[in-house]
């Protein structure tokens, strides 16, 4: 049997599996079946804890979307990852260093039960997002065709270990997240697809956000999306260094000292239950 934990970060839910003490492998088809909320465990992403490839690190962190595809980063998942490895006795550290397929991050368990994640330095270089553009801009013009004919969107583009585009909206409640998100997530200017954030600026220290995630549609919360929105808003001169981000599933705090500096995200990580499935 394979033992797992069901966890969530602000309603963004995960199946978390210990690949350190268990020998596990999941095919994309298996992940799709397990992600099904009627016939499987049901989750937005599967998180796999693996031994480190670098002796200076504690673990390797892998993330799989509900469609079975592996992705580079998940901020809400990172907080759950930290809580999981502590709960399962895989480490007794309060500060945990892990690698992902796209870099390294540091996780810190706080006294109040929250987890703070050093999400690394936001990537603005279009070639590294990846995003097809000639140079770095604070705002890009995206054009796309649909049944609504040609549409144009203004967005910020950034990578937090995974690609994001961020659109500002006047009213988050009435934003066309499903339609526009589905339209932009596979836009040809993003060769690896993109997560699409819809940001309403309340004031310089507070935004509301909804995110259409690549491979998972809209989720209750997206940690990297919150980081991307806070960074884009700051670069555009609309937000402070510390920002409260309200998502449908709850609130995150983002702290960024600006270009060239790592971005820090703080929020909860909740354990729901432990389970097991056949090998």
From Swiss-Prot:
It catalyses: (2S,6S)-2,6-diaminopimelate = meso-2,6-diaminopimelate. SUPFAM superfamilies: Diaminopimelate epimerase-like. The record marks 164, 213 as: Could be important to modulate the pK values of the two catalytic cysteine residues. Signal peptide: none annotated. Transmembrane segments: none annotated. One of its GO terms (biological process) is lysine biosynthetic process via diaminopimelate. Pathway: Amino-acid biosynthesis; L-lysine biosynthesis via DAP pathway; DL-2,6-diaminopimelate from LL-2,6-diaminopimelate: step 1/1. Gene3D superfamilies: Diaminopimelate Epimerase, Chain A, domain 1 (3.10.310.10). The record marks 273 as: Important for dimerization. GO terms for molecular function: diaminopimelate epimerase activity. Belongs to the diaminopimelate epimerase family. Catalyzes the stereoinversion of LL-2,6-diaminopimelate (L,L-DAP) to meso-diaminopimelate (meso-DAP), a precursor of L-lysine and an essential component of the bacterial peptidoglycan. This is Diaminopimelate epimerase.
